[in-house]
Structure formats: structure tokens, C-alpha cells
């Protein structure tokens, strides 16, 4: 995470400790925030596989894997699936609970390249009325 607004930081408690969404996803906070944590963590692993395919020799890739490798649930998901994701369907809404109020919300996510090298991506989250599974 290079930059984000206050709303994103509030919705992702603890992210500032890692500034890395895949590492954050396997910490305690996201499991309380994400209504469908198993779905979101699997998506995170599939996306990480795609990114590591391109940047596997970078120091950042090695650092992320050093942090994730000791986590049993990450290893289970990594080795139990061949899923690779290069994007997120906009109909696949993110369902979360507000960390402060517990109020559920759904978000439509879109990811866009902001430069021609595809080294920096812009994530936009549009809040929608909650439409996830019953809580």
C-alpha cells in the first residue's frame, strides 16, 4: 500500500503495521472485518500468485513470502489451490463489517493501472447497501 485515504485505513485496522494486504489478510483483524474471510483470503492468495509470477525475483516478493510462509492457514491455501487471479470481477462485492460500529456494508471494487508499466495499481471501492450473506 503506497497511499490510501482515511476511510480505507479505518476499514482495514492493523494494515498500517504491514502496509501489505496479503500479509495483513492473514492477521487477526481481517477475520473480524471480512464477512466472507475464507473467500477474501483465497482471492488474496490467488492474486499474490499472479503478482509473484511477474516479480518472483524481487526483494519485496521474497520479503512477503518470508512473512507469510510461517502462517499455517496461508500455507494450506497456497498449496491446496492452483487458482491465479489477475483482477476482480466487479460483481464480486467485498462484504465487510465497520470495525467501529459492526455495521455491514458491501463494496464494488475496481482495479486500474495508473501507469503503463503496471507496477502501480489504483484500487477504488464504491460503497453499496449490504447485500452479502446473512450475518
Question: Language model features by range: what are they?
Answer:
Residues 50-135:
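C-terminal regulatory/effector modules of DNA-binding transcriptional regulators
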Amino acid at each position: 500500500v503506497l497511499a490510501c485515504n482515511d476511510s480505507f485505513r479505518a476499514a482495514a485496522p492493523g494494515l498500517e503495521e504491514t502496509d501489505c494486504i496479503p500479509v495483513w489478510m492473514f492477521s487477526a483483524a481481517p477475520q473480524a472485518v471480512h464477512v466472507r474471510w475464507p473467500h477474501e483470503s483465497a482471492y488474496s492468495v490467488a492474486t499474490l500468485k499472479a503478482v509473484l509470477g511477474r516479480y518472483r525475483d524481487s526483494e519485496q516478493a521474497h520479503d512477503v513470502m518470508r512473512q507469510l510462509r510461517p502462517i499455517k492457514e496461508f500455507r494450506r491455501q497456497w498449496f491446496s489451490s492452483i487458482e491465479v487471479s489477475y483482477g476482480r470481477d466487479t460483481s464480486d462485492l467485498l462484504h465487510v463489517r465497520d470495525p467501529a460500529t459492526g455495521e455491514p456494508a458491501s463494496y464494488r471494487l475496481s482495479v486500474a493501472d495508473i501507469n503503463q508499466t503496471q507496477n502501480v495499481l489504483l484500487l477504488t471501492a464504491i460503497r453499496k447497501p449490504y447485500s452479502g450473506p446473512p450475518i
